[in-house]
From Swiss-Prot:
This is Flagellar L-ring protein. A lipid is attached at residue 21 (N-palmitoyl cysteine). The keyword Lipoprotein applies. PANTHER family: FLAGELLAR L-RING PROTEIN (PTHR34933:SF3). It is found in: Cell outer membrane; Bacterial flagellum basal body. Assembles around the rod to form the L-ring and probably protects the motor/basal body from shearing forces during rotation. It holds the Pfam family FlgH. GO terms for cellular component: bacterial-type flagellum basal body, distal rod, L ring; cell outer membrane. The gene is flgH. Its main location: membrane.
Length: 229
């Protein structure tokens, strides 16, 4: 009776641990902050000097220049135009042949009945191996996502990051993007192609019924780990 009482908590603990491993979340690709940090407290305005152009009113934007992102908190629209094609083929053919012959030309007369015609030996062997392998991958990702400038590098390049979430019925999808962009690559419509973004990290995932269907059950994964085949 005591063994049965002790066995129940152990089984319950094992089931709880197994349930915790039922859904292993994938590792994120975008690991930087997705929004700009909060602005610093406003500084006291400078004393008016009578000029028409006041930097305090226009920020760090020059007077005769388009308003393009250059400060933390500005937004940039990324046009996703990712397309990759890769193919690889391998073929290997190897062969090897070998032979050896061992014999005694003459033996003493008194040993004729013992070893005569018994030391002639022929040994041969062969080995052949053929292997082929092919792999290919095609990926296409198009769309748009608006990001925020989260940092400005010393050379003027902008660190951008952003996220877009879409919830449909019981499922949700999200797109995350981060990278470094040159302000000179940004067009007049405040857009830039994803192919012109350095250190680009693009993440597209979903949560819902479809995501659960594509995930192997925890008990099946357990037996797959324990199976030697």
């Amino acid at each position: 009776m005591l063994k049965t009482v002790l066995r129940l908590p152990v089984c319950a603990a094992l089931l709880a641990l197994a349930a915790g491993c039922a859904m292993i979340p994938p590792e994120p690709v975008v690991i930087c902050p997705l929004t700009a940090p909060p602005p610093s407290p406003p500084q006291p305005s400078a004393r008016p000097n009578g000029s028409i152009y006041q930097p305090s009113a226009y920020g760090n934007y020059p007077l005769f220049e388009d308003r393009r992102p250059r400060n933390v908190g500005d937004i940039v629209t990324i046009v996703l135009e990712e397309k990759t094609n890769a193919a690889k083929g391998v073929a290997t053919n190897t062969s090897r042949d070998g032979s050896a012959t061992l014999g005694v030309a003459a033996a003493p007369r008194f040993m004729d009945g013992i070893i005569n015609d018994k030391l002639d030996t022929d040994i041969s062997g062969g080995n052949t191996a053929n292997g082929t392998g092919k792999s290919s991958a095609n990926n296409t990702f198009t769309g748009t996502i608006t990001t925020t400038v989260i940092g400005v590098l010393p050379n003027g390049n902008l660190q951008i990051a952003g996220e877009k979430q879409i919830a449909i019925n019981r499922g949700s999808e999200y797109v995350r993007f981060s990278g470094v962009v040159d302000p000179r690559s940004i067009t007049g419509s405040n857009t830039v192609s994803s192919t012109r973004v350095a250190d680009a990290r693009i993440e597209y995932r979903s949560k819902g019924v479809m995501d659960e269907v594509q995930t192997m059950g925890w008990l099946q994964r357990f037996f797959l780990i324990a199976s030697p085949f």
